[in-house]
């Protein structure tokens, strides 16, 4: 991992990992390492290494801990855990006159609010979690109901993601059909 990202972005000391292995609100556990890739290609590289080594991967953006999904929960896992913190991969691409966006894994609701302001628009989710730096993905996942139903749906129409196929190999799925280079 260190040879791929550099030691600055691979945290292995307990004190370095603490902020990333404990949610602000909920969840805490041990991780072998916390890695902080800066590009989609670096995320892909890290994922491939983790799949090859058969470690558990927890993808993490803002780590608000609102639902406990971004950190280990306890210490009784059957394999080591690597947390991939995506906050350095935070580009937001505005498309269709501000009606749609492509938000990379670490992009935040606060950043989106700033970008959409140029179009006289605001994000679907502008309550609570926005002020603690929640990611766009987290905002869509956690804030698409309740009081926000009146604003209409917040959802992911198309996505770029990785999955492990039936042969145990990492596979890139690009529903967006936008070409990314590193």
Language-model segments: residues:
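Short beta-strand segments
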Residues: 60-61, 85, 137
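Extended, alpha-helix-rich binding/interface surfaces that flank or overlap catalytic cores
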Residues: 106
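Conserved small/polar residues in nucleotide/adenosyl-binding loops
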Residues: 181-182
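N-terminal flexible segment immediately upstream of the FAD-binding catalytic core
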Residues: 1-48, 65-100, 128, 142
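A gly/ser-rich beta-alpha-beta helix-loop segment of oxidoreductase catalytic cores
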Residues: 66-67, 71-76, 110, 116-176
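Structural detector of well-ordered beta-strand residues that form the stable sheet scaffold
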Residues: 58, 102, 124-126
């Amino acid at each position: 991992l260190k040879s791929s990202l550099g030691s600055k972005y691979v945290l292995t000391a307990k004190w370095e990992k603490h902020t990333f292995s404990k949610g602000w609100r909920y969840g805490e556990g041990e991780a072998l390492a916390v890695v902080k890739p800066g590009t989609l290609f670096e995320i892909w590289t890290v994922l491939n290494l983790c799949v090859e080594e058969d470690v558990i991967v927890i993808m993490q953006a803002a780590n608000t801990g609102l639902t406990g999904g971004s950190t280990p929960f306890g210490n009784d896992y059957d394999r080591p855990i690597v947390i991939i913190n995506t906050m350095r991969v935070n580009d937001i691409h505005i498309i269709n006159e501000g009606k749609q966006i492509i938000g990379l894994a670490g992009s935040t609701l606060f950043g989106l609010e700033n970008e959409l302001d140029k179009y006289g628009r605001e994000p679907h989710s502008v309550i609570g979690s926005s002020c603690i730096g929640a990611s766009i993905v987290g905002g869509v996942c956690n804030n698409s109901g309740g009081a926000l139903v009146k604003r209409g749906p917040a959802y992911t129409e198309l996505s770029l993601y990785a999955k492990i196929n039936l042969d145990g190999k990492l596979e890139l799925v690009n529903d967006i059909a936008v070409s990314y280079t590193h």
